[in-house]
């Protein structure tokens, strides 16, 4: 009869070999990928918001209720994806700063485009 150390060693090696085989099969087996996707999708993504912008984007004074029907969503793709949702009142307050920001980014892209060619 093998010693307990040998049995434990064989079990450990078997588990490591199984993990290695499972890691290699995800590329070849679509079923294993589906299982991984199900495991990852169980937790809903948390909605993060920087603390410095908390009052600017979501006013706690209840003023959003009157302008909730005219909400504006802005999305653009510079070197990264950016999305902003503003109510009508918030857009009126910050439209100049937002326009300048977009203009600066698009102007930089236009300057860099001929240099790349």
UniProtKB/Swiss-Prot annotation:
InterPro entries in the cross-refs: Motilin_assoc, Motilin_ghrelin, Preproghrelin
GO function term, MF aspect, one: ghrelin receptor binding
One Pfam family, short name: Motilin_assoc
UniProt PTM: O-octanoylated by GOAT/MBOAT4. O-octanoylation or O-decanoylation is essential for ghrelin activity. The O-decanoylated forms Ghrelin-27-C10 and Ghrelin-28-C10 differ in the length of the carbon backbone of the carboxylic acid bound to Ser-26. A small fraction of ghrelin, ghrelin-28-C10:1, may be modified with a singly unsaturated carboxylic acid. Also O-acetylated and O-butyrylated on Ser-26 to minor levels.
Gene Ontology annotations of biological process type: actin polymerization or depolymerization; adult feeding behavior; cartilage development; cortisol secretion; decidualization; dendrite development; excitatory postsynaptic potential; G protein-coupled receptor signaling pathway
Annotated localization: Secreted
Positions of O-hexanoyl serine lipidation: 26
Signal peptide per UniProt: 1-23
Residues where lipid is bound covalently (O-decanoyl serine): 26
Annotated keywords: Amidation, Hormone, Lipoprotein, Secreted, Signal
Residues with the Leucine amide modification: 98
Tissue: Highest level in stomach. All forms are found in serum as well. Other tissues compensate for the loss of ghrelin synthesis in the stomach following gastrectomy.
Keyword Chaperone appears in the UniProt entry: no
Region (Disordered): 29-50
Biased composition (Basic and acidic residues): 31-43
Residues with a covalently attached lipid (O-octanoyl serine): 26
GO CC field: axon; endoplasmic reticulum lumen; extracellular region; extracellular space; glutamatergic synapse; neuronal dense core vesicle lumen; postsynapse; Schaffer collateral - CA1 synapse
Propeptide position ranges: 52-75, 99-117
Sequence similarity: Belongs to the motilin family.
Protein name (Swiss-Prot/TrEMBL): Appetite-regulating hormone
Organism annotation: Homo sapiens (Human)
Taxonomic lineage of the native organism: Eukaryota, Metazoa, Chordata, Craniata, Vertebrata
């Amino acid at each position: 009869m093998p010693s307990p150390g040998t049995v434990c060693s064989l079990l450990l090696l078997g588990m490591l070999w199984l993990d290695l085989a499972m890691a290699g099969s995800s590329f070849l087996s679509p079923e294993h990928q589906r299982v991984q996707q199900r495991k990852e999708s169980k937790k809903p993504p948390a909605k993060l918001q920087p603390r410095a912008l908390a009052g600017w984007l979501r006013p706690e004074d209840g003023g959003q209720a009157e302008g909730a029907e005219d909400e504006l969503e802005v999305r653009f793709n510079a070197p990264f994806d950016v999305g902003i949702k503003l109510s009508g009142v918030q857009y009126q307050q910050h439209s100049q700063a937002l326009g300048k920001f977009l203009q600066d980014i698009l102007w930089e892209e236009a300057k860099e485009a001929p240099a790349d060619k």
